[in-house]
Amino acid sequence: MAFAETFKALSDPVRRQILELLKKGALSAGEIASHFDMTGATISYHLKILKQADLIFESREKNYIYYQLNTTVLEEFLLWISTLKGDTSNAERE
């Protein structure tokens, strides 16, 4: 996992808001954009950064692309954070 990309992706408040939206389920780019006062191109840029960090993935359904959280990467990130604070109970289980 490339933590540098993860931190970069999480550093922007718009991208964090997009992740919050996606925790409820898959959304199209248009559905995501409807929650923001910015251009579709700007939303696409933020989605690209989130995809590069593997925080989201896309699936195609007919003419639409839907975006979803990649919980695997989030779990790896949280596990790494927990080892930093000395909580090894999760790491010992694996």
Predicted regions and their residues:
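Short, low-complexity interaction segments enriched in Ser/Thr/Pro/Gly
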Residues: 5, 45-48, 59
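Solvent-exposed, charged/polar functional surfaces in cytosolic regulatory/catalytic domains
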Residues: 13, 50, 76, 80
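DNA-recognition element of transcription regulators
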Residues: 41-43
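N-terminal helix-turn-helix DNA-binding core of bacterial DNA-binding proteins
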Residues: 2-39, 61-73
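Alpha-helical residues within the helix-turn-helix
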Residues: 34, 45, 51-52
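Amphipathic alpha-helical dimerization/coiled-coil segments
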Residues: 1-2, 8, 73-94
